[in-house]
Regions:
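Hydrophobic transmembrane alpha-helices
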Residues: 2-59
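Membrane-embedded alpha-helical hairpins and interfacial helices in multi-pass inner-membrane proteins
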Residues: 27-38, 66-81, 85-91, 95-168
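Membrane-helix interface "capping/anchor" motifs
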Residues: 50-61, 97-105
């Protein structure tokens, strides 16, 4: 029983730290004017690669996104569906964790795709964005490719090299 309690404490702590990092990085993006609107560069999306290393990143990312959207005064649909897009991306990364080493970067694709598909609907229907769905999907996709794709891949290789002994 002691081992299970210790393991649960470790998972809860890691998940909470990931949620806090997500909020902090989103706030940093927001201060720079990059985290909302048609063109979004949320630095926090790079963290969506973390489920490859630890399953507790999944609730951490979801809760972090939920808190970030609440702090940004997002409308109800943005808070719900934006957070669900992050949850879908995190689950996708987790299920792609067994990819060969040279293909690990593909684990960032669920985050990119979930946001490209869901966020344009949120921007159009919740905020009344005047642009077409496909244009918004393109602009959101560019931000996701930069932050989740390149940022997440960079974070993966940095963690793999630097922290591998702690990630078992």
């Amino acid at each position: 029983m002691k081992r299970n309690t210790k393991q649960l404490t470790l998972y809860t702590t890691r998940g909470s730290l990931i949620a806090a990092m997500y909020v902090l990085l989103t706030l940093l993006s927001s201060v720079m004017g990059l985290s909302s609107g048609i063109i979004q560069f949320r630095f926090s999306e790079a963290l969506c690669i973390l489920p490859i290393f630890m399953p507790e990143a999944i609730p951490g990312l979801f809760i972090g996104c939920l808190i970030s959207n609440l702090l940004a005064n997002g409308v109800f649909w943005d808070v719900i569906f934006g957070s669900l897009a992050t949850l879908i991306g995190a689950l996708g990364a987790y299920y792609l964790r067994s990819l060969p080493e040279n293909l690990k970067w593909l684990a960032t694709l669920p985050t990119v795709l979930a946001n490209m598909i869901i966020v344009p609907f949120v921007l159009i229907f919740a905020y009344g964005a005047p642009d077409s769905y496909f244009f918004i999907a393109l602009t959101v996709g560019i931000g996701e490719i930069v932050c989740a794709g390149f940022g997440g891949s960079g974070l993966y290789y940095l963690m793999k090299k630097t922290f591998s002994q702690y990630l078992k």
